[in-house]
Amino acid sequence: MAGPAAHFSDEQFREACAELQKPALTGADWQLLVEASGITIYRLLDQSTGLYEYKVFGVLESCIPSLLADVYMDLDYRKKWDQYVKELYEKSFDGQMVAYWEVKYPFPLSNRDYVYTRQRRDLDVDGRKIYVVLAQNISVPQFPEKSGVIRVKQYKQSLAIESDGKKGSRVFMYYFDNPGGQIPSWLINWAAKNGVPSFLKDMVKACQNYHKKT
């Protein structure tokens, strides 16, 4: 049986790096959604789904890039600090790591789950150390859909991190997520507007409490 295909090209990693230096917001109808606590979020309507793509820019103080990247990649640790995680783990299929992630949704909505692959690269770009993580949904028979949980079949995320020149990190994040089902648009917008800054704050706190396992 063929394994899940690799999704990430060198160009995708370069594009994420480039956004840190010069955000690519021209040539499309990117709208400013929110600007607060050092975090700026833009959104772009995806015509095919009626949902939005998001770009997030900001500085996370008191968390150095290498630590932030380690915390982001550590799924076991995320189960301790992310209150919305119900289940999260990785398995290897034909030499490629595949992650399973179930997210708690508020009643009466059904939980969502994701099956995705991800890759981290620590890059040197013109003397700048940049940590990039790319993630995208895939379909593998080893993770069939569960009864009562809605499978997210469109999910894509990019994260790029570099030093802010002090003791913090400059961050770029792109994500698109089609949660499926009948979720009111106001709730999706609220989650993007409030959930992302809240997640980043939680991640900074997680960095401060993180002790890398040896």
UniProtKB/Swiss-Prot annotation:
Q: Which residues carry this modification: Phosphoserine?
A: 139
CDD domains, alphabetized: START_STARD2-like
Q: Which ranges does the record mark as transmembrane?
A: none
The START domain covers 1-212
Cellular component GO terms, alphabetically?
cytosol
Could you say which residues bind a 1,2-diacyl-sn-glycero-3-phosphocholine here?
A: 72, 78, 157
GO: which molecular function terms? phosphatidylcholine binding; phosphatidylcholine transporter activity
Q: Name one GO biological process term.
A: cholesterol metabolic process
Localization, UniProt: Cytoplasm
> Which positions bear N-acetylmethionine?
1
SUPFAM superfamilies on file: Bet v1-like
Q: Which domain of life is it from?
A: Eukaryota
Pfam families per the UniProt record, alphabetical:
START
| Keywords assigned | Acetylation, Cytoplasm, Lipid transport, Lipid-binding, Phosphoprotein, Transport
Query: Is Nucleotidyltransferase included in the keywords of this UniProt record?
Result: no
Q: How does it assemble?
A: Interacts with ACOT13/THEM2.
Describe its function. Answer: Lipid transfer protein that promotes intermembrane transfer of phosphatidylcholines but no other phospholipids. Binds a single lipid molecule. May play a role in hepatocellular selection and transport of phosphatidylcholines during bile formation.
- Name of the protein described by the UniProt record: Phosphatidylcholine transfer protein
User: Per the UniProt entry, what species is this protein from, by scientific name?
Assistant: Rattus norvegicus
Highest lineage ranks of the organism? Answer: Eukaryota, Metazoa, Chordata, Craniata, Vertebrata
